[in-house]
Amino acid sequence: MTNSSEKQWERIQQLEKEHVEVYRELLITLDRLYLIRKHNHAVILSHTQQRLLEIRHQLQINLEKTALLIRLLEKPDNTNVLFTKLQNLLEESNSLDYELLQSLGAQSSLHKQLIESRAERDELMSKLIELSSKFPKPTIPPDDSDTAGKQVEVEKENETIQELMIALQIHSGYTNISYTI
């Protein structure tokens, strides 16, 4: 490129940046004006809403640029360096848009698959709850400490009964007493 065409290109880039910035500010101001008129007061946007507005502004700016490029492409001049660069930028933008469309399609199918999996899981959970309600509640096995305590109690009762029997035998005068029962 010659020196003058480089200067032209730099000037075009500078003007384009200024145009994009002014247009972005215009869109932001128009959005705020619309929200104020609609709600009769200033609206405070959350971070997510602010980000969505910025994306919308970017899309509007890109649409405006694309429209200008299409108008320029309708009058092709193959010797024009600007035409060639703009055509390359438009092709690159189209390829990026296609990649974005592909990734959004993949994300959409994964999201759909996730929703279907969640629905299947919920259905299986409801079936499991229904089936589990048909079975009796499990009985709680007795604690080992309870059985050990009952065993000690039974042994004490046995000793007491044995002592009572011996006392009865002595009291009744039975002579053939066996002290071990």
UniProtKB/Swiss-Prot annotation:
Coiled-coil regions listed: 112-171
Record's keyword annotation contains Electron transport: no
GO cellular component, one term: nucleus
Highest taxon listed in the record's lineage: Eukaryota
Cellular compartment(s): Nucleus; Chromosome, Centromere, Kinetochore
Assigned keywords, A-Z: Cell cycle, Cell division, Centromere, Chromosome, Coiled coil, Kinetochore, Meiosis, Mitosis, Nucleus
Any matching Pfam family: CENPH
GO biological process terms held by the UniProt record: attachment of spindle microtubules to kinetochore; cell division; chromosome segregation; establishment of mitotic sister chromatid cohesion; meiotic cell cycle
Additional observations: Present with 279 molecules/cell in log phase SD medium.
Function: Component of the kinetochore, a multiprotein complex that assembles on centromeric DNA and attaches chromosomes to spindle microtubules, mediating chromosome segregation and sister chromatid segregation during meiosis and mitosis. Component of the inner kinetochore constitutive centromere-associated network (CCAN), which serves as a structural platform for outer kinetochore assembly.
Quaternary assembly: Component of the heterotrimeric kinetochore subcomplex CTF3, which consists of CTF3, MCM16 and MCM22. The CTF3 subcomplex is part of a larger constitutive centromere-associated network (CCAN) (also known as central kinetochore CTF19 complex in yeast), which is composed of at least AME1, CHL4, CNN1, CTF3, CTF19, IML3, MCM16, MCM21, MCM22, MHF1, MHF2, MIF2, NKP1, NKP2, OKP1 and WIP1. Interacts with CTF19.
UniProt record similarity statement: Belongs to the CENP-H/MCM16 family.
Protein name: Inner kinetochore subunit MCM16
Gene responsible for this protein: MCM16
